[in-house]
Amino acid sequence: GVTTWWTTYVGRVMGQGLGGASTCLLVATGGAIVSYIPVGQMASKIGRKKTIQGGVVLLAACFASAYFLTTHYQSINAVMFVVFALVGLAWAAINVNSLPMVVEMCKGSDIGKFTGYYYTFSMAAQVVTPILAGTLLKHISYSMLFPYAAFFVACSFVTMCFVRHGDCKVEAK
């Protein structure tokens, strides 16, 4: 939802153009790229589940911060770039470890089936949430984008608390 609606949000809520909005998304992507390998290494030390949960907490905090920043400032600023870089880090912590957890839960012959489940539900969420978020933004307020995102990210933390399988064996210290 955030990626889909961000450029419209910046125009409606902040009165800004596409340049700053696009730069924020570029910074988030850069933050993710530089984080992929380190979060994979971190997961081998503390576990995938804890790494994902840390990413989820950071992402929710970033979305809450983005709400505050975008509703209290009329222009994109350096603090927003830092927040978006952290969004990239958080997203990397979640993404790098999610599919490996699914694969760890199944037997070798079931990897394709479980990968199919993973991508089906992941892609379905990516189709549904922009529609749901768009309806909310249209009928309530565009300023609801980040509270909406933070809420559903927090819900994902709750679901991760119930995950019992698929974690890696943590390296000995």
Language model segments and positions:
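Helix-to-loop junctions at the C-terminal end of transmembrane segments
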Residues: S35-R48, L137
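Intracellular juxtamembrane helix-capping segments at the cytosolic ends
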Residues: A93-K107
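A membrane-interface helix-boundary motif in multi-pass transporters
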Residues: T135-V153
